[in-house]
UniProtKB/Swiss-Prot annotation:
Region listing for Fe-S binding site B, in residue ranges: 314-328
Free-text comment about domains: The C-terminal domain binds 2 Fe-S clusters but is otherwise mostly in an intrinsically disordered conformation.
Organism encoding this protein: Ajellomyces capsulatus (strain NAm1 / WU24)
Keyword Iron: yes
Name used for this protein in its record: Fe-S cluster assembly protein DRE2
Gene responsible for this protein: DRE2
GO biological process, one term: iron-sulfur cluster assembly
Length: 351
């Protein structure tokens, strides 16, 4: 089967054990324009296909001369890669070059009435989802989207000028006394009484006005059309029983075990306000506890160790805090020998 353009042969792995069949297939194609790839290597990602390269992709049959093995290996990702390797207007064919018989199922093809297995049905759905379509011959074709061009529609200049002239003439022929001038055969304009205009439509022909009565800027009391409508008070829609009814918390707002309850961003069940009030109460309690721990200037006792001759009354100042009295000036200092000089360096006691 001689073909023009670049051809990609997709072979199932079972065909590799029959080199005589594979060589016979390769002899029917031009070798410099034909590429051969194994479906199992493509499925495992060991090789890749170039995009928009091949005019025809040919699915080869397996060792049993059926496409069952080929269909089982063609998954969704692999089919999309095969479709991307096709050029626009490229075709996906089988080895026998027979119509797929899956285009419409109306009996036009010989194979359209048979029952397909799961792999064939899945293959049909996947190739359609990948972007292939059936042509008139029942072959799978990649549509050429670039060939479709949008043609802008433009009104002719003469038509625009004619419409403008007709509008101006209609406005000019309308007179103030309610008559319309109609040209006669002798060129003299004869007055023709115009149709009586009603109060609902006092608009001359060919002239349009915009009705702003439906705008939101018109107050309700000034709009005669909406004056009879009854206004509903939102507060009357809920009674006391509805206001006192317990709020049902949605499942998504319920906290999971071991986690703190959190409100949604657009919370409408009251959880956000409840958590905010609880946080404020905790913060106020903590601030109040801190205030009780603060000492005033009159409550602070300053111990001056530089004053000479200042000794404790118990005589146990050098033994440590365990032996010192409550008013001992050496509280907080380590034990020392009587008469030893005590120095402070960087707020640390140096004995």
């Amino acid at each position: 089967m001689a073909t023009t353009g670049r051809v990609l042969l997709l072979s199932p792995p079972s065909l590799s054990s029959h080199p005589e069949k594979l060589n016979a297939i390769l002899k029917s194609h031009t070798r410099d324009k034909t590429d051969l790839q194994m479906l199992d290597r493509l499925a495992h990602g060991l090789v890749s296909l170039p995009e928009s390269t091949y005019d025809i992709v040919l699915l080869l049959t397996g060792a049993d001369n059926t496409l069952a093995e080929t269909h089982s290996l063609l998954n969704r990702e692999l089919i999309q890669r095969v479709v991307h390797s096709l050029r626009p207007a490229g075709k996906l064919r089988n080895r026998e070059n027979k119509p797929w018989g899956l285009s419409d199922g109306n009996g036009s093809n010989a194979n359209s009435s048979r029952r397909y297995n799961d792999d064939e049905q899945r293959f049909r759905n996947e190739v359609i989802l990948a972007g292939l379509v059936f042509d008139d011959k029942g072959e799978l074709l990649k549509p050429d989207i670039g060939a479709q061009q949008a043609i802008p529609l433009k009104l002719s200049r003469r038509r625009k000028e004619k419409e403008k002239t007709d509008t101006l003439a209609s406005s000019a022929n309308y007179s103030t006394n309610g008559t319309v001038g109609a040209p006669s055969s002798n060129g003299i304009s004869a007055p023709i009484p115009a149709a009586k205009t009603t109060e609902n439509n006092p608009v001359p022909p060919g002239v349009g006005f915009i009705d702003f009565s439906d705008d939101f800027g018109v107050p309700a009391e000034d709009d005669p059309q909406d004056s009879d409508e009854e206004l509903i008070d939102e507060d009357e829609l809920l009674d006391e029983d509805d206001m006192g009814r317990q709020i049902v918390q949605p499942p998504e707002c319920r906290p999971k075990p071991g986690k703190r309850r959190r409100a949604c961003k657009d919370c409408s069940c009251g959880l956000s306000q409840k958590l905010e009030a609880k946080d404020k109460a905790k913060r106020a309690t903590a601030d109040k506890a801190l205030e009780t721990m603060k000492l005033g200037s009159s409550e602070l006792a300053e111990v001056d160790f530089t004053v000479q001759g200042k000794v404790g009354s118990c005589g146990n100042c050098s033994l440590g805090d365990a032996f010192r009295c409550d008013g001992c000036p050496y509280i907080g200092l380590p034990a020392f020998k009587p008469g030893e000089e005590v120095r402070l360096l960087n707020n640390d006691v140096q004995l």
